[in-house]
Amino acid sequence: MIRTAHDQQRPGVRNPFLGLFNFIAKVYVTVIRGTPMMVQLLIWSSVVFLSSRSYTMIGILGLGINSGAYVAEIIRGGLMAVDGGQMEAGRSLGLNYMDTMRFIVIPQAIKAILPALGNEFIILLKDTSLITVIGGKELLYAAQGIMGRTYEAMFPLIGVACVYLVMVMIFTWLLGKLERRLRQSDRR
């Protein structure tokens, strides 16, 4: 939202605080999107939280920070995609900036970004398997435990793949229902 507000400022009318926050947001997005998630997780577990042994929580934090950068850009793109005339229309109706964003711009942006947000959530869901690398306990970690006891790799890994596939299929189905429901509101 900060980046969108900064990008939509009129020339000559600049808010210095918005400029500072925009710079911080740009650095955050650039650094996080420009480095592999595996490296980020290793930095979180081996450098930042060196003394902590709660690897699952470190993994969740790392995944959240990584996904946040992508979600921020998805939201920014969705807000920028809404025609500027919508903001002017809201203002001409007497709505202030916040009400115009809340009642006019954001509902349109949500419809535009829903597929991309769904894809980001699916990627995040599948990336949870990377937590195993730093010692976090999750689905792949459990499969590795089974493989260590049974010396069988194929069935535990296929089982994990099937569980992830079912979770993704359920989420995709729910997302499709939500998209259809939002499309119905367009027809009214």
Language-model segments: residues:
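Transmembrane alpha-helices and adjacent helix-loop boundaries
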Residues: 1-188
